[in-house]
């Protein structure tokens, strides 16, 4: 067995601290750089003050670990703060220098930036570390929890500087993002002030986190990383179970396409893919049955009725859409919503003359798979198997390795010479997870998942949630989103949950800005 060096996830950034030369005042808003922008909203001129600053004392990626604070002239001390994340694929986290562009005219109804400026909201964006970062001195510092830690540090920066900010209420922070950004937004909203993140926050010099004499970490009052609410789209969350969830939902669809020859992955042996699919689907059954989630009537959600629960959520969105745009337009949507020419309704949604309808989830899944080719199996953790460009494995692992499989199947079947997996450690997934290194990996996985923190319930969970996932979006399993919706709706700390599927939306976000920001305005 090859000997490998493994370290705790909580010390991923420790090595860079000794070389940091930034001083305490680097996270003081008073030292930020200011630029005056002139934009317009619906043709009306508006001045915006743009501030740029460091948000941590010890950055190891200083070109990205920067924060933008945009304050329109109509903002006040009571204005909410819209906190924008990027994080596409857990990769696209570089510092954005054009969240608000000088001279641009914004739409004050359908553009989220335009709405924020029109209403006098403070807009914040930032850059952070990601799994795509090059190693620093041979160490991979972009693994989990780096992205979450940096995001929390940026939020802490705002609270640390509450008295210096010209406008904006730091207790009214709403975080928003799409896809990986949706996942990041939801996990931040679910894990407010969780001690899980204190060590990594301390190591980068985030505001308000101290190391006590007894070796424990603490957070100062008034410098927390909790948020008031979240607007999230298609969150790629619960990664530890996402591969299994994908095959549990799409396994039968995949088998039909395999038999009919409609499934084509030129770089994968289809027999290997189908074997992986079956094994992963079985794992998800065990996971679902262990959660103890309940529906609105108090009935336990299990592997035998979860599809019925998903279908019920789809019915809710179909009913809403019927009342909003009507049956005729919906039928047109079904046939025109295609990337490969005209699509034919395969009977997944059929309306009767009197206006009633029948919905078939299995046919709906096939319809979705015709729209966009299904991800391979495993869908998210497969770098050590047969796919090198469609996975999230580089989000995990110690700083000594470029990536790590993050579920049982991918670990046990890893084939690459990479220092991880059963082939290199000699340990099965279950055996490895009993080790100190395995527990560190489990914590890394947890720190990317809103569901884990919602079910645990010990953090300062955001009280307001607006989350959507498109009915034509196959980038993660409908099961993952259904469980997320359920965990949000049944959490006692959540005051308002506006969650659900979105009529025939693909993998995308911010398609319902008027609705989402109307919801936000009612809360405020």
Language model features by range: what are they?
Residues 67, 78-90:
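Short beta-strand element of the alpha/beta-hydrolase
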Residues 85-148, 191, 505-506:
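Cap/lid segment of the alpha/beta-hydrolase catalytic domain
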Residues 10-18:
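Hydrophobic h-region of N-terminal signal peptides that target proteins for export
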Residues 141-164:
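Alpha/beta-hydrolase active-site loop
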Residues 21-77, 436-447, 456:
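N-terminal cap/lid segment of alpha/beta-hydrolase-fold proteins
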Residues 160-252, 445:
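Primarily recognizes the serine-hydrolase "nucleophile elbow" in alpha/beta-hydrolase
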Residues 326-524:
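C-terminal subdomain of alpha/beta-hydrolase-fold enzymes, centered on the catalytic histidine
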Residues 216, 232-237, 241-382:
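Non-catalytic, alpha-helical, charged scaffold/linker segments
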């Amino acid at each position: 067995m090859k000997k490998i060096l493994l370290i705790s996830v909580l010390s991923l950034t420790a090595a860079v601290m000794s070389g940091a030369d930034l001083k305490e005042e680097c996270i003081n808003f008073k030292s930020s750089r200011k630029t005056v922008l002139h934009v317009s909203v619906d043709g009306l001129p508006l001045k915006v003050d743009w501030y740029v600053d460091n948000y941590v004392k010890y950055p190891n990626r200083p070109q990205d670990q920067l924060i933008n604070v945009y304050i329109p002239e109509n903002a006040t001390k009571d204005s909410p703060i819209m906190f924008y994340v990027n994080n596409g694929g857990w990769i696209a986290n570089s510092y954005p220098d054009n969240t608000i562009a000088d001279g641009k005219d914004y739409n004050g109804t359908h553009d989220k930036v335009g709405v924020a400026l029109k209403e006098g909201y403070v807009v914040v964006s930032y850059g952070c570390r990601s799994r795509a970062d090059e190693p620093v001195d041979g160490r991979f510092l972009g693994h989990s929890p780096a992205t979450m830690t940096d995001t929390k540090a940026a939020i802490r920066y705002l609270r640390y500087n509450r008295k210096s900010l010209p406008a904006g209420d730091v207790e009214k922070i709403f975080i928003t993002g799409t896809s990986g950004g949706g996942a990041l937004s939801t996990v931040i909203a679910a894990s407010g002030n969780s001690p899980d993140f204190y060590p990594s926050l301390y190591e980068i010099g985030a505001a308000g986190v101290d190391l006590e004499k007894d070796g424990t970490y603490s957070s100062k009052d008034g410098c927390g990383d909790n948020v008031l609410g979240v607007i999230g789209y298609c969150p790629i969350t619960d990664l530890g179970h996402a591969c299994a969830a994908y095959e549990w939902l799409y396994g039968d669809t995949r088998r039909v396409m395999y038999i009919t020859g409609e499934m084509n992955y030129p770089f994968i042996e289809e027999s290997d893919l189908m074997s992986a699919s079956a094994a992963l689907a079985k794992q998800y059954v065990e996971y679902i049955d262990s959660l103890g989630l309940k529906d609105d009537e108090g009935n336990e959600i299990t592997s035998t009725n979860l599809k019925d629960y998903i279908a019920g959520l789809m019915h809710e969105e179909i009913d809403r859409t019927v009342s909003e745009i009507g049956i005729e337009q919906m039928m047109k949507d079904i046939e025109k919503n295609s990337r490969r020419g005209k699509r034919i309704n395969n009977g997944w949604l059929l309306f009767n003359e009197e206006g009633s309808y029948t919905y078939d989830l299995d046919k709906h899944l096939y319809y979705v798979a015709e729209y966009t080719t299904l991800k391979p199996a495993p869908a998210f953790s497969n770098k050590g198997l047969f796919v090198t460009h469609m996975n999230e494995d580089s989000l995990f692992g110690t700083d000594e390795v470029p990536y790590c499989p993050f579920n049982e199947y991918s670990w046990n079947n890893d084939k690459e010479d990479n220092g991880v997996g059963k082939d290199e450690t000699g340990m099965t997934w279950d055996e490895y997870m009993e080790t100190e290194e395995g527990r560190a990996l489990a914590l890394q996985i947890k720190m990317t998942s809103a569901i884990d923190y919602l079910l645990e319930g010990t953090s300062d969970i955001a009280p307001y949630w607006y989350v959507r996932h498109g009915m034509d979006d196959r980038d993660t399993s409908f099961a993952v989103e259904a469980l997320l919706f359920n965990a949000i709706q049944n959490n006692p700390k959540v005051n308002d949950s506006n969650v659900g599927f979105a009529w025939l939306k693909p993998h995308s976000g911010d398609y319902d800005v008027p609705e989402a920001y109307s919801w936000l305005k009612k809360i405020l």
